């Protein structure tokens, strides 16, 4: 998979002055004696992240579910426990709607009673299974949802059958969810201790939902392996992941930009953008430091945010993901019933016009709007490309956080709201 990176800005950037720092942090990411080795399982790929025996077990389970007409999987999880899988499904399949295909529904990522109620109403007519994902089981959103949905499944089909349709992805060492799974004799998949949630899509956390949806997980793994090798050098000129990390750092530190907007030209990248926001937001946003990760989908958001991006305050830069080959395309035919200027576009395809919009917008924002633009061009939206892009961003994120002087692998600020909520509820986490 080819990934191209192009910077469009008048700002002069000196990358080579940082090579020694990059070398130091590269060693920290890759050295087996790194002080952060207990958080680097995602980078020990595929040896630590991939469990072939567990994937084989998942395949058999999925095959059995499909043979028994279980056509809906409800994934219960929040943050990294669902964003990666949702991003992958949309990236690879598109947004549909789909007929006669396995469906994956995501719950437990909010405390909305309305959303939960409406999805349960939908499930009343479906044959469904549950995959609850939580390292410990003490996160309130998925914990509540699992309790409600598991009871609903028992009411629908009985406890004995419900146990055969409920799958738990959690730590195999300890935790409340592990104890629940064991005491109820539920199937368990492993959350690897050395892989944090936001880095976990290329592991069992992401693979079971993807296998259920008949995604080619082997191709995802192959794409990630290729990216892992490609971005294994410390050379800034040869490692685009590190070059992207350094570009972000320079925008923040040397030129005082506070926000990075990740822009895509395909609606099916909405949740990829959300995954990226968690990856960088939780990894960098600490010690009063870090770029605020925002996102937009063009051309849709050009009709809401376009004015601000062009003429508003200049505290942001843009990173653009552009997919060279669309999944599908449509030609525009002349319609004699319409006496319209749009008829002049007949003979073109929708993707050709989208590409011209990308070129025009990038020029307008970078040249006339004075917004630095970094373009990441990818070949397609295949499973292999997804695996490659995830590994690219994960490596870039670790380097970017180290350059910033923060720990990429903790998220102490998230605990603050959790602890206060537990106090309000009188709940012992």
Curated annotation (Swiss-Prot):
Protein's job: Catalyzes the reversible isomerization of glucose-6-phosphate to fructose-6-phosphate.
Cell location: Cytoplasm
Classification via Pfam families: PGI
CC annotations in GO: cytosol
NCBIfam families: PRK14097.1
Catalysed transformations (reactions): alpha-D-glucose 6-phosphate = beta-D-fructose 6-phosphate
Listed EC numbers: 5.3.1.9
UniProt xrefs under InterPro entries: G6P_Isomerase (IPR001672), Phosphoglucose_isomerase_CS (IPR018189), SIS_dom_sf (IPR046348), SIS_PGI_1 (IPR035476), SIS_PGI_2 (IPR035482)
HAMAP family reported in the protein's UniProt record: G6P_isomerase
Protein name: Glucose-6-phosphate isomerase
GO terms, molecular function: carbohydrate derivative binding; glucose-6-phosphate isomerase activity; monosaccharide binding
PROSITE patterns: P_GLUCOSE_ISOMERASE_1 (PS00765), P_GLUCOSE_ISOMERASE_2 (PS00174), P_GLUCOSE_ISOMERASE_3 (PS51463)
Keyword field: Cytoplasm, Gluconeogenesis, Glycolysis, Isomerase
Organism the protein comes from: Mesomycoplasma hyopneumoniae (strain 7448) (Mycoplasma hyopneumoniae)
């Amino acid at each position: 998979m080819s990934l191209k990176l192009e910077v469009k800005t008048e700002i002069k950037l000196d990358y080579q002055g940082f090579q020694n720092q990059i070398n130091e942090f590269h060693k920290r990411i890759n050295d087996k004696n790194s002080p952060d080795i207990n958080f680097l399982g995602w980078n020990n790929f595929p040896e630590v992240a991939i469990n072939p025996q567990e994937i084989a077990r998942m395949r058999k389970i999925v095959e059995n579910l499909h043979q028994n007409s279980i056509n809906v999987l409800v994934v219960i999880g929040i943050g990294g426990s669902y964003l990666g899988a949702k991003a992958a499904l949309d990236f690879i399949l598109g947004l549909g709607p789909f007929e006669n295909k396995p469906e994956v529904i995501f719950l437990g990522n909010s405390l909305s009673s309305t959303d939960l109620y409406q999805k349960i109403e939908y499930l009343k007519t479906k044959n469904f299974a549950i995959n609850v994902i939580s390292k410990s089981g003490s996160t309130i959103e998925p914990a509540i949802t699992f309790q409600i949905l598991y009871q609903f499944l028992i009411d629908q089909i009985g406890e004995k059958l419900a146990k055969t349709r409920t799958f738990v992805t959690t730590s195999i060492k300890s935790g409340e969810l592990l104890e629940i799974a064991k005491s109820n004799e539920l199937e368990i998949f492993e959350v690897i201790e050395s892989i944090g949630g936001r880095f976990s899509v290329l592991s069992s956390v992401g693979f079971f939902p993807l296998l259920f949806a008949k995604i080619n997980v082997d191709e995802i793994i192959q794409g990630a392996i290729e990216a892992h090798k490609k971005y294994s050098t410390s050379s800034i000129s040869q490692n685009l992941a590190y070059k992207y990390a350094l570009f972000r750092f320079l925008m923040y530190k040397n030129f005082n930009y506070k926000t990075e907007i990740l822009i895509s030209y395909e609606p099916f990248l909405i949740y990829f953008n959300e995954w990226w926001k968690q990856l960088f937001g939780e990894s960098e946003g600490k010690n009063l430091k870090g770029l605020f990760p925002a996102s937009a989908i063009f051309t849709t958001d050009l009709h809401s945010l376009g004015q601000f991006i062009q003429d508003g305050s200049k505290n942001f830069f843009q990173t653009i993901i552009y997919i060279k080959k669309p999944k599908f395309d449509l030609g525009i035919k002349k319609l004699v019933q319409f006496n319209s200027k749009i008829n002049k576009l007949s003979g073109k395809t929708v993707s050709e016009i989208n590409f011209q919009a990308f070129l025009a917008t990038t020029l307008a924002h970078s040249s006339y709007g004075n917004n630095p633009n970094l373009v990441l061009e990818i070949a397609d939206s295949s499973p292999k490309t997804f695996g490659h892009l995830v590994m690219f961003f994960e490596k870039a994120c670790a380097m970017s956080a180290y350059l910033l002087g923060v720990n990429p692998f903790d998220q102490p600020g998230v605990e603050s709201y959790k602890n206060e909520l537990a106090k309000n509820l009188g709940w012992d986490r």
